[in-house]
């Protein structure tokens, strides 16, 4: 009986924390001074007046971010290599899951996907600076080339495509968002899902983020566990 009571107390404290987290997120939303930026594709393109960014850090022109992350044939050293798990987490355009067991998916993994995939990651044949990236084994950006990607993928998010390293160009200033409204929406939904899983605001705020990215609304009737799985995917 004592163990049962202790477990109940722990559960109540956990629920109180989720409730407090939801309220904190809702308080930020209700300020009414932030709004989702219209285009995910240009969300991270150094707009210092971005309506979505709540807290950000600025870096000057000497960051060399492009030099350290461009694909190797473009003068970079491919520093950040996104993982296959990250690539696979992006849904299909219709909201279904991507699967390597689907023959069409496997042949063209970058086609008919959530637009945020191609806005975030340079896959094989992605067009960068008007030419196709060659991430395949034997390609100019593929395995075996010095400093080439180790995963088959390069970072695209935050990179300034106008920088030309090969002609002596350097980096430009960068903005790193530490908190943005999309995260607050999903924090709110996640916390609500834990202590009030029937609350209609859960789907409402997740779908706002999905809609901005061009993804369909979540199917209705998702269980609490299913929603736990779908909320993180909506943030990618």
Task: Give names to the regions the model predicted.
Residues 5-74, 78, 84, 98-235:
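Acidic/polar-rich alpha-helix caps and helix-coil junctions
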């Amino acid at each position: 009986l004592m163990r049962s009571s202790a477990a109940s107390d722990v559960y109540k404290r956990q629920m109180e924390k989720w409730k407090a987290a939801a309220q904190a997120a809702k308080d930020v939303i209700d300020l009414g001074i932030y709004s989702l930026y219209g285009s995910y594709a240009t969300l991270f393109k150094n707009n210092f007046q971005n309506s979505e960014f709540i807290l950000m850090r600025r870096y000057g022109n000497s960051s060399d971010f492009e030099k350290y992350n461009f694909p190797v044939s473009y003068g970079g050293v491919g520093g950040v290599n996104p993982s296959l798990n990250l690539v696979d987490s992006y849904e299909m355009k219709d909201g279904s899951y991507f699967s390597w067991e689907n023959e069409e998916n496997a042949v063209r993994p970058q086609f008919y996907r959530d637009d945020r995939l191609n806005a975030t990651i340079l896959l094989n044949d992605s067009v960068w600076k008007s030419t196709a990236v060659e991430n395949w084994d034997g390609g100019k950006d593929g395995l075996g080339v010095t400093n080439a990607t180790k995963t088959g993928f390069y970072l695209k998010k935050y990179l300034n495509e106008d920088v030309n390293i090969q002609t002596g160009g350097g980096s430009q200033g960068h903005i790193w968002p530490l908190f943005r409204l999309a995260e607050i929406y999903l924090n709110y939904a996640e916390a609500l899902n834990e202590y009030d899983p029937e609350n209609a605001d859960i789907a409402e705020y997740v779908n706002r983020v999905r809609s901005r990215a061009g993804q369909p609304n979540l199917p209705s009737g998702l269980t609490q566990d299913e929603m736990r799985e779908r909320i993180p995917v909506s943030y990618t």
